[in-house]
Amino acid sequence: MKTIQLGEKVVVSDPCYELPTWCQAVIENVLPGEYDCKVITKDMGMWGIRNTELIVTKSGLVPELLTWEETPFDIGVDSGQAGVFSFESYRNDNHIKEVQFINGKSPFDGGYVPKENEDGEGWYEKMCDLTLSTDESAGTYDQGVVTSSGIGDGSYVLYTASKEGKVVGFKVDFLLEDEEDEEDDWDDED
């Protein structure tokens, strides 16, 4: 299972969006610390294995034992991915510049070229690398997790869980889940 560090303020969004954007969530009153990241997958036949949910919970808590509440936020997706990020690292090029590309080069080599010299575009390129260059179509860095969004773009439901007045869990539902979904436990050694 992969872990990340979250602060008291968290962004749940497609990483292509700048702040503020109407179809993202900025959640305050988060219990800071280490969080476990899980991706739930499902075999969608001709679509292949797809990510149906992203679940991020405070380490030591069991997601199935939490009470999840639907939020009023629509998590819009236009780049085929969404994630949970500590506010201070969101679209922060300086925060992510030491992270290497998975295959040693940008996933956009020979294709789309991010807008150079625009704040957040280097960070966005690294988020795309995590979803485009991994078998899981998902990945983490120290303060965030990003995953491909099921079958693609759309508007998705965000749930949160709280304990003692603090948010301790986030769940993005890509609207594909049912009882046959499989939990993908990432190995920290990847």
Model-derived regions, located:
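Intrinsically disordered, low-complexity acidic regions enriched in Pro/Ser/Thr
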Residues: 1-190
